[in-house]
From Swiss-Prot:
PROSITE patterns given in the database record: FATTY_ACID_DESATUR_2
Database matches in InterPro entries: FADS-2_CS, Fatty_acid_desaturase-2, Ferritin-like_SF, RNR-like
Annotated organelle transit peptide span: 1-33
Gene Ontology MF: a single term: stearoyl-[ACP] desaturase activity
Subunit structure: Homodimer.
Binding residue positions for Fe cation 2: E176, E229, E262, H265
Listed cofactors: Fe(2+)
Any one Gene Ontology cellular component term annotated for this protein: chloroplast stroma
Blocked amino end (Ala) modified-residue sites: A34
Cellular localisation: Plastid, Chloroplast; Plastid
Entry's family note: Belongs to the fatty acid desaturase type 2 family.
Annotated protein name in UniProt: Stearoyl-[acyl-carrier-protein] 9-desaturase, chloroplastic
Organism classification: Eukaryota, Viridiplantae, Streptophyta, Embryophyta, Tracheophyta
UniProt keyword list: Chloroplast, Fatty acid biosynthesis, Fatty acid metabolism, Iron, Lipid biosynthesis, Lipid metabolism, Metal-binding, Oxidoreductase, Plastid, Transit peptide
Organism of this sequence: Carthamus tinctorius (Safflower)
Length: 396
């Protein structure tokens, strides 16, 4: 989400400085989500390409984890099977999109669709912008499975590997796939949005990929997914609350059900990182600090509809204004993870580890202070057209 923020730079000893730009990009979940922190890689390639938008350019680092640490992940496969796979649900016990939608085989289908559309008419355009942005991000699921399979030591080496890491990745993907299916079909039936523009945006986004800067490291990767799943839980929970406020209890149920899945997935990913802190506290706190210095970028930050080069920033600004995902949420999530992993209580760290510990523990209040200053200076945002809603204009 976007805030108008005066540039401020804070220095942390031996750590890269971070700065808040005039208009920060607070990536919205799995949006994935980013912080109010500005990008440390300002270069932009503006050359138009047939299947991807202009994008930030930075040096891509690969395979940064020392090879010997791969053994850590092999050594805890038994633990993962017992403690991580339990957070998956058997398919026969999972909800499916059809459970929440008009039944096309029913004689009452037409009437059910009319009722859905009548409820949707009462919901404002800005809410639909956020709901569409969330759905598009969910629909880029092929990218997220690909990202998990870049991680050394835990990737699915065959496409049908029986290691618990590979089983988790495939089953997690299968569970997540229902989210996009459900939201996509709801939006199609609502009649409120331009489905062709939305579908183009999805194709552009999948074609563009993502680079969360996890460097093939499962340390960085699982810290990233821990943050993202909690951010998604927050975002879908807030869209549920707004839907209820607008009188659409069934849409609120849809968003709340998706949020519940995200919470369960968050639990699994945070348990993995908790285990890494137990086995390798120094390496894990260094990875945590590294990920936070680079900022948590949203998987959908390359969102593009063929028209608006700043589509993600515009979508994020609307979500920020509505309170669906905000700078405060970013700080709250970071503070939650610091507490969940008991980072402040770590002992026996190296000198670099202690500095990383101080950095991540001190970051949430620093973000909040800067956000409060930014809110004090915030100006009323402009209105921009969104192709997703037939170019109707929405205030940022």
């Amino acid at each position: 989400m976007a805030l108008r923020i005066t540039p401020v730079t804070l220095q942390s000893e031996r750590y890269r400085s971070f700065s808040f730009p005039k208009k920060a990009n607070l990536r919205s979940p799995k949006f994935a989500m980013a912080s109010t922190l500005g990008s440390s890689t300002p270069k932009v390639d503006n050359a138009k390409k047939p299947f991807q938008p202009p994008r930030e350019v930075h040096v891509q680092v690969t395979h940064s984890m020392p090879p010997q640490k791969i053994e850590i992940f092999k050594s805890i496969e038994g633990w993962a099977e017992q403690n991580i796979l339990v957070h998956l649900k058997p398919v026969e016990k999972c909800w499916q999109a059809q459970d929440f939608l008009p039944d096309p085989a029913s004689e009452g289908f037409d009437e059910q669709v009319k009722e859905l559309r009548a409820r949707a008419k009462e919901i404002p355009d800005d809410y639909f912008v956020v709901l569409v942005g969330d759905m598009i991000t969910e629909e880029a699921l092929p990218t997220y499975q690909t990202m998990l399979n870049t991680l050394d030591g835990v990737r699915d080496e065959t496409g049908a590997s029986l290691t618990p890491w590979a089983v988790w990745t495939r089953a997690w993907t299968a569970e997540e796939n229902r989210h996009g299916d459900l939201l996509h079909t709801y939006l199609y039936l609502s009649g409120r949005v331009d489905m062709r523009q939305i579908q183009k945006t999805i194709q552009y986004l999948i074609g563009s990929g993502m680079d969360p800067r996890t460097e093939n490291s499962p340390y960085l990767g699982f810290i990233y997914t821990s943050f993202q799943e909690r951010a998604t839980f927050v975002s879908h929970g807030n869209t549920a609350r707004h839907a209820k406020d607008h009188g659409d209890v069934k849409l609120a149920q849809i968003c709340g059900t998706i949020a519940s899945d995200e919470k369960r997935h968050e639990t699994a990913y945070t348990k993995i990182v908790e285990k890494l802190f137990e086995i390798d506290p120094d390496g894990t706190v260094l990875a945590f600090a590294d990920m936070m210095r680079k900022k948590i970028s949203m998987p959908a930050h390359l969102m593009y509809d063929g028209r608006d080069d700043n589509l993600f920033e515009h979508f994020s600004a609307v979500a920020q204004r509505l309170g669906v995902y905000t700078a405060k949420d970013y700080a709250d999530i970071l503070e939650f993870l610091v507490g969940r992993w008991k980072v402040a209580d770590l002992t026996g760290l190296s000198g670099e580890g202690r500095k990383a510990q101080d950095y991540v523990c001190g970051l949430p209040p620093r973000i909040r202070r800067l956000e409060e200053r930014a809110q004090g200076r915030a100006k009323e945002g402009p209105v921009v057209p969104f192709s997703w809603i037939f170019d109707r204009q929405v205030k940022l």
